[in-house]
């Protein structure tokens, strides 16, 4: 486990040290692997101070190095870079309760969360990501992508009601409101990737899926397969040759289509899913701390 030392430009007061001591085991990202850093490279403040777009901050956060605050020594913090497979005590910085077995990821702060900024020193503030279950992180990404796509071709007054509904998420009895969408280059890239991927899936998937569904229904007469077959039969028309024996060239072409479709599905998953950093082994009684295995 690597140690990272963070030195502050400002003298830490007793109150500052007391505040930091209450933040032991908090996850703090840093831009890159360095043994010694300044407070300017600690946490998300360098990003959130200049950019308020959730998608942009999320994309930068995905590239950052995870560390865990271990202790305060004088005017510096001692951070540990976790090792895969090892157990660590992790502080819950998110609004949602954790449960044993949860997979956890990191997301940018939400504007409705009251503990986004934990310590202020001069012009600098300690801003950390929220550690949340991957399921809610994916739901947030999906909703933001949906809002962005709707906003591209709808008038504001036409979509306001549905956007208000999409922006409110209740998860484990906790209600949050999503940040505002900024359709900048980062968001537009996500929407473009989603549209290109969906276009290719729409163009290539129906024929090959229909072929496999037809074959599978001969072996398995489940109602779900039959319903899928009926749905596809309304959308696609297959030549009788497709049901016969495939030539080598046809098989190669078919394989390319399958790989392309799966690649496009993976592209969409990359827009909505977040990687797992921790798996919860045990949770404290107040749900503010958990023993977790580092998985990244």
From Swiss-Prot:
- Keywords, in A-Z order: Capsid protein, Host nucleus, Virion
Q: Which InterPro entries match?
A: Herpes_capsid_2 (IPR002690)
The UniProt record lists the keyword tRNA-binding: no
Q: Which GO terms describe its cellular component?
A: host cell nucleus; viral capsid
- Keyword match Lipid biosynthesis: no
Role description: Structural component of the T=16 icosahedral capsid. The capsid is composed of pentamers and hexamers of major capsid protein/MCP, which are linked together by heterotrimers called triplexes. These triplexes are formed by a single molecule of triplex protein 1/TRX1 and two copies of triplex protein 2/TRX2. Additionally, TRX1 is required for efficient transport of TRX2 to the nucleus, which is the site of capsid assembly.
Subunit and partners? Interacts with TRX1 and major capisd protein/MCP.
Q: Which family does it belong to?
A: Belongs to the herpesviridae TRX2 protein family.
**MF terms per GO, please?**
structural molecule activity
Q: Give its localization.
A: Virion; Host nucleus
What Pfam families does this protein's entry cite? Answer: Herpes_V23
Q: Which residues form the signal peptide?
A: none
Q: What is this protein called?
A: Triplex capsid protein 2
The highest taxon in the source lineage is Viruses
Give the gene that encodes this protein: TRX2
């Amino acid at each position: 486990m690597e140690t990272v030392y963070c030195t502050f430009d400002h003298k830490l007061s007793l109150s500052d040290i007391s505040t930091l001591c209450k933040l032991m085991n908090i996850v703090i990202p840093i831009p890159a692997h360095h043994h010694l850093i300044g407070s300017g490279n600690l946490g998300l403040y360098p990003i959130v101070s200049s950019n308020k777009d959730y998608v942009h901050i999320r994309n930068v956060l995905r590239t950052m190095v995870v560390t865990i605050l271990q202790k305060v020594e004088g005017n510096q913090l001692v951070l540990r870079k976790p090792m895969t497979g090892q157990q660590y005590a992790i502080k819950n910085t998110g609004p949602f309760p954790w449960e044993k077995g949860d997979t956890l990821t990191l997301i940018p702060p939400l504007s409705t969360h009251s503990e986004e900024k934990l310590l202020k020193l001069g012009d600098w503030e300690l801003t950390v990501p929220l550690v949340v279950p991957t399921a809610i992180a994916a739901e947030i990404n999906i909703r933001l992508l949906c809002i962005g796509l709707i906003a591209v071709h709808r008038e504001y007054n036409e979509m306001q009601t549905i956007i208000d509904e999409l922006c409110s998420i209740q998860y484990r009895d906790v209600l949050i409101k999503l940040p505002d969408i900024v359709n900048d280059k980062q968001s537009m890239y996500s929407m473009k990737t989603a549209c290109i991927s969906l276009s290719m899936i729409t163009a290539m998937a129906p024929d090959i899926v229909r072929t496999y569904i037809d074959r599978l229904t001969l072996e398995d007469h489940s109602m779900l397969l039959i319903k899928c077959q009926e749905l596809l039969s309304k959308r696609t028309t297959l030549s009788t040759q497709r049901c016969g024996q495939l030539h080598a060239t046809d098989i190669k072409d078919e394989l390319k289509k399958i790989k392309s479709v799966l690649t496009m599905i993976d592209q969409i998953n990359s827009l909505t899913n977040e990687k797992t950093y921790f798996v919860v082994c045990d949770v404290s009684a107040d749900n503010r701390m958990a023993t977790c295995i580092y998985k990244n």
